[in-house]
C-alpha cells in the first residue's frame, strides 16, 4: 500500500499478509442538522474488526478491566487526525456539488467487552454552503479497498434534528464488472490493491432529501 493511515500501518505490521481487504469496519451514521434546520454534517460510528481492536487495546486493559474511553481518547485523536489526509474516507455532495469537511469534532472511542471490539465515534462537519441542502449524498469507502466499510444491517443511517419532510435512504451499488471481479480475485493473498476505485464501486450511497 502506498497510502496507509497510522492505525492501519500498525495493523499491517502486526498481522500477516491477507487478501484485500485487510481491515473490516461496520458502520452506522447519523446525518445531523442544526437547530436552525441547516445541514451540520455526519456523525460516524465505525466498529473495527476484532484483530484491529485487540491490537490497539493490548496494553490498555488493567486488572482484567475493559479499556476506558479516557484510555482510548489518544487513539481516537490519532485516528481522526490521520483520516484528514484521506478526506475521512467520505465523499459527499450537497445539491449535486462536491463539498469538503471541516475538522472533526466530538471524537471518542468505546470498547464493547462482549465482542471485544472498539468503535470510533466522531462528527464530520460539512463546510458552510450558501444554499439550503435540498439533497445530500455521501459514500464511505477506501478507494483501494485496504479497508472494507459496510453498514450495519439494522438502522444503518438515521436523521438527527432534520426539518419536517426530510427523508433518508441507502442505495446499494451495482454489481462489479467481470474485469473488476478478476482484479479483486487476483489481489487475494497479496498486498496489492485490486484498483484505486474498487472501494467506491462497492460503496453504498446514503441519500438525504429535504423539501
Question: Where does each model-flagged region fall?
Answer:
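Cleaved targeting-peptide boundary
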Residues: 18-25
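Mature, soluble, non-transmembrane domains
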Residues: 95-211
Amino acid at each position: 500500500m502506498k497510502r496507509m493511515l497510522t492505525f492501519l500501518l500498525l495493523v499491517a505490521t502486526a498481522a500477516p499478509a491477507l487478501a484485500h481487504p485487510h481491515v473490516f469496519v461496520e458502520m452506522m451514521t447519523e446525518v445531523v442538522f442544526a437547530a436552525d434546520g441547516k445541514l451540520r454534517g455526519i456523525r460516524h460510528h465505525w466498529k473495527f474488526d476484532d484483530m484491529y481492536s485487540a491490537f490497539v487495546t493490548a496494553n490498555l486493559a488493567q486488572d482484567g478491566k475493559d479499556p476506558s474511553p479516557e484510555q482510548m481518547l489518544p487513539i481516537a485523536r490519532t485516528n481522526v487526525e490521520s483520516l484528514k489526509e484521506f478526506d475521512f474516507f467520505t465523499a459527499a455532495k450537497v445539491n449535486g456539488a462536491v463539498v469538503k469537511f471541516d475538522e472533526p469534532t466530538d471524537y471518542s472511542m468505546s470498547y464493547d467487552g462482549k465482542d471485544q471490539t472498539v468503535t470510533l465515534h466522531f462528527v464530520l462537519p460539512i463546510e458552510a454552503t450558501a444554499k439550503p441542502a435540498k439533497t445530500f449524498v455521501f459514500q464511505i469507502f477506501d478507494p483501494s479497498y485496504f479497508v472494507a466499510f459496510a453498514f450495519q444491517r439494522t438502522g444503518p443511517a438515521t436523521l438527527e434534528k432534520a426539518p419536517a419532510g426530510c427523508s433518508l435512504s441507502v442505495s446499494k451499488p451495482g454489481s462489479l464488472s467481470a474485469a473488476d471481479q478478476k482484479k479483486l480475485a487476483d489481489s487475494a493473498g497479496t498486498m496489492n490493491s485490486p484498483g484505486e476505485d474498487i472501494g467506491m464501486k462497492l460503496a453504498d450511497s446514503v441519500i438525504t432529501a429535504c423539501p
